[in-house]
Amino acid sequence: MKTVLKNCRVLGTTHDKDMLHDIYVENGIIEKIGLNLEVEGAKQIDVGGHTVMSGLIDMHCNICDPGHEYIEDIATASRAALRGGFTTITCEPNTDPVIDNKTVVEYIVSKSKEKSLVNIYPYGSMSIGCKGQEIAEIGEMYDAGIVGISDGDEFTDSAAFLRNVMIYTKMFDLPVLTHCEDRSLSGV
């Protein structure tokens, strides 16, 4: 199906945001952005100057799957994300069981491919059980599909532990995401 979206304010590209552009879409794929596009046989929709932009990315989602799917699962999280304009989300590791091994990563990746309307990328836990004591098997989780390391909403109490995680994680060129808070200073 061919569609031309007319009079779009295109945000996040090299196009002048103060000019209205047309977007030619064929079979769900943007083929061209330009001025006064005419495509034979295309349905034309005037969007009246509304903003069109790339999908958003949420890098801190607490999806309750696995473990508490009655609250939210991968399918419902993806529907909520898509409704809000997000085309990619990450999955924090503080699920039940924690994403601290390749089996749980494989579950998230597989279920996301099967049920999700958006891209879902899991973070692996930096520690077993998100407890900040023993380093999780980051290499195996990396091979299974994690895109970063985090202990979710848990604090890292030991700078030495975090340093060791960073050294290990550097081998895989993965980002380490952590709450920058020291309980001994914050009184938590």
What is each residue range found by the language model?
Residues 1-39:
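N-terminal metal-binding scaffold of metallo-dependent hydrolase/deaminase domains
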Residues 5, 43-45, 57, 90, ...:
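Hydrophobic/aromatic beta-strand patches that form the interior of the parallel beta-sheet core
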Residues 8, 23, 28, 49, ...:
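Divalent metal-coordination and catalytic microenvironments
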Residues 95-106, 111-188:
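Histidine/acidic-residue-rich, glycine-tolerant segments that coordinate divalent metal ions
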Residues 37-52:
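Active-site metal-binding motif and surrounding structural segment of the metallo-beta-lactamase
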Residues 11, 92, 152:
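Conserved residues at the C-terminal ends of beta-strands
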Residues 48-112:
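Metal-associated gating/positioning segment near the N- to mid-region
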